[in-house]
C-alpha cells in the first residue's frame, strides 16, 4: 500500500507538470525511486496509473466539498466558500491539479467541474428562491460566473507556478473578485454613473 501511495503521488506531480502524453512510467519510476518492475506490478499501464491519480484527486475534491456543505450556511455563502475551497485545493493539492489536467487531456474522462457544478447550480437555485440573489441574477448565469472564476484561477496558478516570480495566492485573489461580484463595480447610486447599453438583456 505504501508503494502504491508513493507512486500515485509521484505520478500526480509528473502529470501535473508535463501532462499525460508528456509523462512516462520510466519517468515516474525514476522520480519515485521505485523499480519499473514494481511500478508495473501495481500499475501495468500508464493509463491505469492515471486513473488512480484521477480517482484520488476526485476523492480529495469530494471530501472537501462535503466539509464545506456540512457547515449549513445560507446557500449563497456556501457557494462562495465552496469556490474558495476549490481554489485552495488547486493551489495546494498536487493530486487535484493533476486530476484537473488529466480529466481535460484524456478522452472519455469526466470533467473535474462536473464534480461540483451541479452542487453550485442547486445552491444558487436555492439562493434565488430564498431572495439571496437579485431578481435579474439568474442562477444559470451565476453558475457560469463561478465556472469562469475557477477556470481563471487554474490558468492563473499554472502560469505563475512554473516561474520563480512571487505571486499572489489564488484564494486571496478570488476573495477580492467575489467582493467585486457581490458588491459591484459600477457607482450606480452616484450622479453621472455610466450606463452599459451593450449589457442590456434582449427584449
Stretch-by-stretch model annotation:
Residues 1-18, 25-31, 47-52, 60:
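Basic, helix-initiating cap at the start of DNA-binding domains
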Residues 6, 77-85, 141-148, 172, ...:
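Amphipathic alpha-helical interaction segments
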Residues 21-22, 133:
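Short, charged helix-capping/linker segments at alpha-helix termini
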Residues 32-43:
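Short hydrophobic/aromatic patch on the recognition helix
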Residues 52, 63-92, 96, 105-108, ...:
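Hydrophobic alpha-helical connector segments
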Residues 59-62, 105-132, 137-148, 172:
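Amphipathic alpha-helical packing segments from all-alpha helical-bundle domains
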Residues 98-106, 196-199:
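Short linear capping/connector segments at secondary-structure termini
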Residues 114, 118-130, 159-203:
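C-terminal peripheral helix-coil segments that are non-catalytic and often amphipathic
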Amino acid at each position: 500500500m505504501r508503494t502504491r501511495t508513493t507512486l500515485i503521488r509521484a505520478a500526480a506531480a509528473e502529470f501535473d507538470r508535463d501532462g499525460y502524453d508528456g509523462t512516462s512510467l520510466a519517468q515516474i519510476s525514476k522520480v519515485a525511486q521505485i523499480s519499473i518492475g514494481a511500478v508495473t506490478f501495481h500499475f501495468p499501464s500508464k493509463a491505469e496509473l492515471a486513473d488512480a491519480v484521477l480517482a484520488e484527486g476526485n476523492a480529495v475534491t469530494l471530501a472537501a466539498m462535503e466539509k464545506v456543505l456540512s457547515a449549513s450556511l445560507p446557500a449563497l455563502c456556501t457557494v462562495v466558500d465552496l469556490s474558495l475551497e476549490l481554489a485552495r485545493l488547486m493551489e495546494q493539492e498536487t493530486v487535484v491539479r493533476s486530476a484537473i489536467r488529466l480529466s481535460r487531456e484524456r478522452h472519455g474522462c469526466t470533467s473535474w467541474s462536473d464534480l461540483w457544478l451541479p452542487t453550485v447550480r442547486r445552491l444558487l437555485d436555492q439562493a434565488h428562491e430564498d431572495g439571496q440573489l437579485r431578481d435579474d441574477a439568474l442562477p444559470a448565469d451565476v453558475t457560469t460566473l463561478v465556472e469562469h472564476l475557477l477556470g481563471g484561477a487554474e490558468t492563473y496558478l499554472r502560469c505563475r507556478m512554473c516561474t520563480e516570480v512571487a505571486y499572489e495566492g489564488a484564494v486571496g485573489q478570488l476573495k477580492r473578485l467575489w467582493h467585486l461580484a457581490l458588491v459591484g463595480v459600477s457607482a450606480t447610486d452616484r450622479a453621472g454613473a455610466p450606463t452599459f447599453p451593450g449589457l442590456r438583456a434582449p427584449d
